[in-house]
């Protein structure tokens, strides 16, 4: 049977949250009250350094909006009215930093969804209009706005035909899940170099449209993240040594800087990973998902980055922190710390009270997952203090997101408190916190995971439970039917 953990909304104030943190034996600072500007550490400006040829940027405050895909672009890869609405919400947030808006594919074949945004010469002007629409909604100083660039790798689904995986190496567990069979699925070294050129072209286009930075995405099981774990790969971009497995990262960053020298470069990085998890069959009951359990795997487990080879549900920090320390010399000035993947370890990547339809019940109190993510951001900041560090996982803290975030920023754990799922249900939360306004509790994200379950069912993403706009759309009924069918199939 799945274990029920105390829900954040049931905790009577910050002291109760601290008691729960202590009971779990994790470390997570939490203030008694969320402070308004100017007293709040979250209200202080932050300067983001720049490499030679670029100018530093100053963020007005320490809130950041995380990239949140809607899977609602037009078929040609340009924004739709739904995309525009979401980005306007990011603008209304009042956050000092908008990390990419959402993932934008640098190759059409590298989309994770047929309705993912694409950047090329035909779509870039529309992305520029999206950025300007976001800025027009800002309630205060304009935020720093980046664009997240990606190739979805083994999770590529560019059309309705289904997955068309391109992989860095054959994975002992994930190949079965994604149908990545044969050597034709493996990206060749020549194709990897073409990809580096596509990232550079995308960066040049983003700079021309006024974006402050690009994110060379290395997280969540997508292609560039997978290269970091490519120990079994032959050729220039894989092997036992970290230097070989980060060669593609270095070449892409160098190409981006050469193509757009005035642009800042960031990396959203899964700083650690885990062996893939699955629902435990023995724990399922009455249509409920069983708790997550690790897939059986041979040891040593060499298919993860930041994973202990002999205990693949634990972290080995040596390579991740070595990479973080190397980033400033490459010209990277921002890092957004995350972990794992939503496809195979969602409890690690986005702690939630309610699992997505294709996931599993939490195998741990999600609060422990938040503590692990914020500790990872703390480690990254300690390893490279000159980097601007964004933390992830704070949406799960709900009413207490600012209580914890301001305590962490004050203590120097990280520079920016990232909010992702919260930016869908309640984008204005940062502005309300900094203005000292009471929070709109009916809009606070409760981690229902419908923003993930909907695209798994082929629907656009959005906060169906809490956002009246999505609650009234016909997709809500389709989502309810899909979730019911999934329960009946268990």
Task: Annotate each predicted stretch with a short phrase.
Residues 1-490:
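Flavin-dependent oxidoreductase catalytic cores
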């Amino acid at each position: 049977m799945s274990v029920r953990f105390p829900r954040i909304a049931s905790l009577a104030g910050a002291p109760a949250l601290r008691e729960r943190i202590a009971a779990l034996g994790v470390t997570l600072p939490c203030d008694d009250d969320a402070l308004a500007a100017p007293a709040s550490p979250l209200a202080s400006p932050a300067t983001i350094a720049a490499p030679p040829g670029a100018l530093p940027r100053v963020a007005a405050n320490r809130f950041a909006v995380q990239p949140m895909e809607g899977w609602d672009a037009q078929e040609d890869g340009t924004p739709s009215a739904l995309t525009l609405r979401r980005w306007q919400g990011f603008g209304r947030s009042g956050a000092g930093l908008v990390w990419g808006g959402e993932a934008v594919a640098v190759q059409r074949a590298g989309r994770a969804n047929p309705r993912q945004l694409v950047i090329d010469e035909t779509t870039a002007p529309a992305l520029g209009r999206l950025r300007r629409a976001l800025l027009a909604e800002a309630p205060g100083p304009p935020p720093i706005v980046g664009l997240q660039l990606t190739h979805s790798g083994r999770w590529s689904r560019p059309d309705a035909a289904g997955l068309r995986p391109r992989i860095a190496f054959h994975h002992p567990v994930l190949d079965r899940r994604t149908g990545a069979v044969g050597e034709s699925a493996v990206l060749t070294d020549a194709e990897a170099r073409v990809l580096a050129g596509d990232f550079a072209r995308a960066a040049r286009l983003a700079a021309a449209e006024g974006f402050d930075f690009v994110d060379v995405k290395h997280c969540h099981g997508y292609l560039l993240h997978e290269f970091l774990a490519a120990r079994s790969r032959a050729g220039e971009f894989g092997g036992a040594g970290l230097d070989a497995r980060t060669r593609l990262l270095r070449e892409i960053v160098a190409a981006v800087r050469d193509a757009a020298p005035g642009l800042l470069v960031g990396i959203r990085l899964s700083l650690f990973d885990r062996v893939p998890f699955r629902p435990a069959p023995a724990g399922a009951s009455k249509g409920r998902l069983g708790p997550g359990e690790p897939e059986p795997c041979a040891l040593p487990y060499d298919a993860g980055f930041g994973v202990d080879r002999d205990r693949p549900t634990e972290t080995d920090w040596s390579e991740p922190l070595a990479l973080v320390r190397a980033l400033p010399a490459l010209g990277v000035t921002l890092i957004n710390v995350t972990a794992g993947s939503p496809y195979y370890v969602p409890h690690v990547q986005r702690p939630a009270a309610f699992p997505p339809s294709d996931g599993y019940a939490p195998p741990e109190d999600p609060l422990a997952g938040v503590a692990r993510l914020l500790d990872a951001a703390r480690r990254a900041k300690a390893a490279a203090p000159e980097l601007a560090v964004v933390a992830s996982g704070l949406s799960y803290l709900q009413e207490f997101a600012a209580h914890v975030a301001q305590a962490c920023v004050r203590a120097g754990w990280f520079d920016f408190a990232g909010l992702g799922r919260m930016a869908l249900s309640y984008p204005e939360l940062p502005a309300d916190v900094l203005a000292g306004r009471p929070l709109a509790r009916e809009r606070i994200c409760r981690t229902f995971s419908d923003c993930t379950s909907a695209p798994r069912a082929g629907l656009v993403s959005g906060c169906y439970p809490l956002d009246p706009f999505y609650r009234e759309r016909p997709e809500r009924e389709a989502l309810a039917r899909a979730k019911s069918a999934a329960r009946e199939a268990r």
